[in-house]
């Protein structure tokens, strides 16, 4: 869908959904420019554009942690952690919009941390809401947590929503019939197909998607029973299947990750009263909670949406570990974790390439 929409003049949404109000307006011009610089090859331009989105996420994570802690080495380790997560490795390589959502959300937090003026926050939020309008809720949560002023929040939200309508109209003026208008209620009917019943397997899958599979990749499910291609999934509710950690490297990496997660939680609770960036940490938790509630019933494959919360998890951990960030032993631990992630998640990429190679 994105490959065709970004590299050809067929920009109409195949699924005719309204949740991406002016995504084409945001993505197609830079892809066209990169394609022009690459001798007219728009496909390579799209791949470079996505890779730049992934790189931007890493840079923004570094900027955020460096601004919060003043420690460049620690900031580099946390930025590398984000870049080496399964979520960012995959979506920094595929022609999809999710890596840019992560980048826009990261940018918003950087601007909040640096106490930038309202116009800058509005501009960052426009990118977020233009790609997928539901994620504007994350901007609202972050804004109100850091700037708890009702009038300011109303002014911020109203400005973004007014500009959203204008840019959506411009998007469909420049790219006719790209997708239906989001402000027409009937267009939401297309999302009914993405609603699933809440059961014990879904809750288990949700927990793993938010804290494990998005960082430490499990053994993927490859499915081709009733479709003309091989489907890569971590959760397949249609057949009640959920990916597991089967290999030794997967188990070692997941246990190491769990240990550092628990350590971060303990540090956060221990230092909660004297925490320098407490409200930003709470905002990050709030954004994760929003995604949990959203996906209780919405979404078939949670990993597909994982960039929407992986950034928040990594930034929260970066702030929680701040009290030990300058300790050499902890930096060595992070380096060891990064090494395990390179091995484990690199194996995932190799597996996907080997399975898909015969189809290319």
Residue positions per predicted region:
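Short hydrophobic/aromatic helix or loop-helix immediately within or flanking a transmembrane segment
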Residues: 12-40, 44
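Aromatic-rich transmembrane-lumenal/periplasmic boundary elements in polytopic membrane proteins
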Residues: 1-13, 156-219
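Specific aromatic-rich, kink-prone transmembrane helix
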Residues: 100-120, 312-316
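Transmembrane-helix motifs of polytopic, lipid-linked glycan transferases
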Residues: 48-68, 263-267
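Membrane-interface alpha helices of multi-pass inner-membrane proteins
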Residues: 118-148, 159, 163, 336-337
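Transmembrane-helix signature of polytopic, membrane-embedded enzymes
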Residues: 61-84, 277, 282
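Short acidic/glycine- and proline-prone juxtamembrane loop motifs at membrane-interface regions
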Residues: 93-98
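Hydrophobic, aromatic-rich transmembrane alpha-helices
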Residues: 227-228, 232-236, 243, 250-275
């Amino acid at each position: 869908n994105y490959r065709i929409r970004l590299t050809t003049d067929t920009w109409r949404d195949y699924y005719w959904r309204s949740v991406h109000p002016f995504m084409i307006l945001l993505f197609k011009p830079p892809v066209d420019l990169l394609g022009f610089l690459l001798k007219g090859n728009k496909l390579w331009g799209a791949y470079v554009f996505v890779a730049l989105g992934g790189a931007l996420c890493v840079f923004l994570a570094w900027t955020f942690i460096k601004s919060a802690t003043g420690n460049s080495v620690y900031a580099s380790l946390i930025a590398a952690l984000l870049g080496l997560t399964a979520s960012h490795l995959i979506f920094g390589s595929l022609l999809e919009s999710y890596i840019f959502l992560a980048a826009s959300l990261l940018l918003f937090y950087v601007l909040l941390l640096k106490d930038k003026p309202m116009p800058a926050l509005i501009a960052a939020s426009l990118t977020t809401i233009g790609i997928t309008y539901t994620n504007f809720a994350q901007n609202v949560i972050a804004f109100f947590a850091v700037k708890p002023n009702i009038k300011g929040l109303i002014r911020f939200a109203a400005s973004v929503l007014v500009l959203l309508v204008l840019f959506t109209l411009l998007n469909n003026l420049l790219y006719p019939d790209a997708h239906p208008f989001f402000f027409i209620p009937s267009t939401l009917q297309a999302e009914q197909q993405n609603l699933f019943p809440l059961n014990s397997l879904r809750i288990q899958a949700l927990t793993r998607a938010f804290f494990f599979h998005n960082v430490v990749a499990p053994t993927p499910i490859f499915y081709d029973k009733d479709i003309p291609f091989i489907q890569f999934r971590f959760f397949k509710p249609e057949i009640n299947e959920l990916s597991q950690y089967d290999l030794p490297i997967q188990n070692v990496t997941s246990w190491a990750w769990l240990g550092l997660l628990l350590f971060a939680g303990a540090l956060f609770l221990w230092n909660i009263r004297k925490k320098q960036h407490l409200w930003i940490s709470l905002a990050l938790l709030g954004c994760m909670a929003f995604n949990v509630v959203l996906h209780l019933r919405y979404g078939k494959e949670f990993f597909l949406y994982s960039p929407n919360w992986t950034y928040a998890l990594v930034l929260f951990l970066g702030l929680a570990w701040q009290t030990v960030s300058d300790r050499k032993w902890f930096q060595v631990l992070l380096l060891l974790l990064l090494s395990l992630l390179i091995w484990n998640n690199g194996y995932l990429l190799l597996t996907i390439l080997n399975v898909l190679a015969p189809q290319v």
